[in-house]
């Protein structure tokens, strides 16, 4: 069973074609069931956005997927096929990683695509078409996309320390104007950051501070709301962006609090910018899949990188993706070997049991134990070596050299052993 990606996008097809093969959300379950009912496809997920329609699937033979895509939309295959691309295994994995990381987007590094890929995986899981291969693929995809966005400047052009928080948010959310922002603290750094966010026109801003009077004063200047610190835990799911900088000696935002918020948000991403020293947000929060946590050091590094970091980020992102593709394919190949490993062990166990039973019969007859053990070891050795020996002696011509190489590698032999 192999993984494949098939589809078309803004690089290969005009809008007039893309809109004709887009999947409506209310027909997605039906489409997934129909695709996997075709017998040639065992697992499937469908990503359908304004700029792309892609099928990610596991199959023995991928050819019929294009026929199915055209047929589902009642289009002649000849009308669709000139715009289609099809990627097998390695190329498919790399493509999905690049898509989710924003490297294949119309706007380089745009953040919405990751949420759309997550939604495609969720819909496939709900429809029962997300099997072991695709589940593992999407797990790796989300981890790669997060690594790319967290460790490169693929979606940002940072120009100042205070503006960095807004630009870091822009890596994850295309429009800050659609987001709800929470500021924890009311000192100078928070005020500077809040001014930059206000310039981006977020949907709402809220200030939480230990001293309510300072929170109210800052909120009044920004046209923001206020909140008590002890209300953050319950209110956190409402916010898409959290910027914190207090003088608290202990973290204000804990792992459990954020885990609950992510669950309530149905895994919509949340950006946390922690400018405090000591930190206001527990570091473990950064390990959560849907949380993008940045510290004061992260902002400093991005500022130092400057405007040229964007093109360098593409190179860095491609390097990350290439490494992660190799890792995923290693898992795939190891998984493919499992049936052979199981059969090999079962074969060896059958031989072992046969020799043990023969030895026990000989011992029951009163034969010399040392002789019985010698016979057992020789018998087991001969039976285990019979297959490799036969493999070598039956090889002919150029195949004999290859057979010798395989056996030497298999048993960790050198030519002088």
Swiss-Prot record:
Q: Which domain of life is it from?
A: Bacteria
The reaction(s) catalysed by this protein are: (S)-4-amino-5-oxopentanoate + tRNA(Glu) + NADP(+) = L-glutamyl-tRNA(Glu) + NADPH + H(+)
Keyword Transmembrane: yes or no?
Answer: no
Record-annotated residues binding substrate?
Answer: 49-52, 105, 110-112, 116
Q: Where does NADP(+) bind?
A: 185-190
Q: Which pairs of positions does the record mark as disulfide bonds? A: none
Question: Keyword Transmembrane on this protein?
Answer: no
Tell me what else is known.
During catalysis, the active site Cys acts as a nucleophile attacking the alpha-carbonyl group of tRNA-bound glutamate with the formation of a thioester intermediate between enzyme and glutamate, and the concomitant release of tRNA(Glu). The thioester intermediate is finally reduced by direct hydride transfer from NADPH, to form the product GSA.
Domain observations: Possesses an unusual extended V-shaped dimeric structure with each monomer consisting of three distinct domains arranged along a curved 'spinal' alpha-helix. The N-terminal catalytic domain specifically recognizes the glutamate moiety of the substrate. The second domain is the NADPH-binding domain, and the third C-terminal domain is responsible for dimerization.
Similarity section: Belongs to the glutamyl-tRNA reductase family.
Q: What is said about its interaction partners and assembly?
A: Homodimer.
**Name of the protein this chain belongs to:** Glutamyl-tRNA reductase
Protein's organism: Azoarcus sp. (strain BH72)
Recorded name of the encoding gene: hemA
């Amino acid at each position: 069973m192999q993984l494949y990606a098939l589809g078309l996008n803004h690089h290969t097809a005009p809008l007039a074609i893309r809109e004709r093969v887009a999947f409506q959300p209310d027909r997605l379950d039906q489409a997934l069931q129909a695709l996997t009912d075709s017998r040639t496809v065992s697992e499937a997920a469908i990503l359908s956005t304004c700029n792309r329609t892609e099928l990610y699937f596991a199959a023995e033979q991928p050819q019929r997927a294009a026929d199915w895509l055209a047929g589902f939309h009642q289009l002649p295959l000849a009308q669709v096929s000139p715009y289609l691309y099809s990627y097998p295994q390695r190329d498919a994995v790399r493509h999905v990683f690049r898509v989710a990381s924003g490297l294949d987007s119309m706007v380089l590094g745009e953040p919405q695509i990751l949420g759309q890929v997550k939604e495609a995986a969720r819909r496939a899981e709900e429809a029962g078409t997300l099997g072991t291969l695709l589940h593992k693929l999407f797990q790796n995809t989300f981890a790669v996309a997060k690594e790319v966005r967290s460790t490169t400047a693929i979606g940002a052009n940072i120009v100042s320390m205070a503006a960095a928080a807004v630009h870091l948010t822009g890596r994850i959310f295309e429009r800050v104007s659609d987001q709800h922002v929470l500021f924890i603290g009311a000192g100078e750094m928070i005020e500077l950051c809040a001014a930059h966010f206000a310039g981006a026109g977020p949907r709402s801003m809220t200030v939480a501070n230990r001293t309510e009077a300072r929170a109210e004063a800052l909120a009044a200047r920004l046209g923001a709301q206020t909140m008590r610190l002890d209300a953050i835990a319950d209110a956190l799911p409402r916010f898409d962006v959290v910027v914190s900088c207090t003088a608290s000696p202990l973290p204000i935002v804990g792992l459990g609090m954020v885990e609950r918020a992510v669950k309530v948000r149905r895994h919509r991403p949340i950006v946390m910018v922690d400018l405090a020293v000591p930190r206001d947000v527990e570091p473990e929060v950064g390990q959560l899949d849907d949380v993008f946590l940045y510290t004061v050091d992260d902002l400093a590094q991005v500022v130092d990188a400057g405007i040229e970091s964007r093109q360098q980020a593409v190179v860095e992102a491609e390097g990350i993706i290439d490494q992660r593709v190799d890792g995923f394919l290693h898992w795939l190949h190891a998984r493919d070997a499992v049936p052979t490993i199981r059969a090999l062990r079962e074969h060896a166990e059958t031989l072992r049991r046969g020799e043990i039973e023969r030895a026990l019969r000989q011992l029951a007859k009163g034969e010399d134990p040392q002789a019985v053990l010698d016979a057992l070891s020789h018998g087991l050795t001969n039976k285990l070596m019979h297959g490799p020996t036969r493999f070598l002696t039956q090889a002919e011509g150029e195949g004999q050299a290859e057979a010798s190489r395989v056996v030497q590698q298999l048993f960790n032999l050198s030519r002088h052993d």
